[in-house]
Amino acid sequence: MRDELIRIVECYLDGLKNKDLSKVAFASDVTFEGPLSPKLTGERAVVEFLTGLFPAVKDVRVKQHIVEGEYVATLFDFDTTFGVIPVFDCFRVSNGTLKQIRPFYDPRPITNPQESSEGHV
């Protein structure tokens, strides 16, 4: 069970990295809620939003997965045109599909690139 949940999450992360979400098993009512977006509901809305990120994506490097029940928390480095952004993503996997995606990260490299490059905290 644990390995299957991780496989589903890694398919999503590989999809971001390779700029191709066609193999990702999204639930039809998947939700995505991040620091810079309102809560999105439905596969079409989520895929549309994520596809908009593709031009900024350079790499995704997974550091760790933590699995409990149907939840997977994944720590990864999101290498983007804004720099490397450490992300802690909380996923809910239900019936073999991604049901919830909730990323947590510091948005300053995106919202204020000058400030983050100067090292202000």
Locate predicted features.
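C-terminal and inter-domain tail/linker signature
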Residues: 1-121
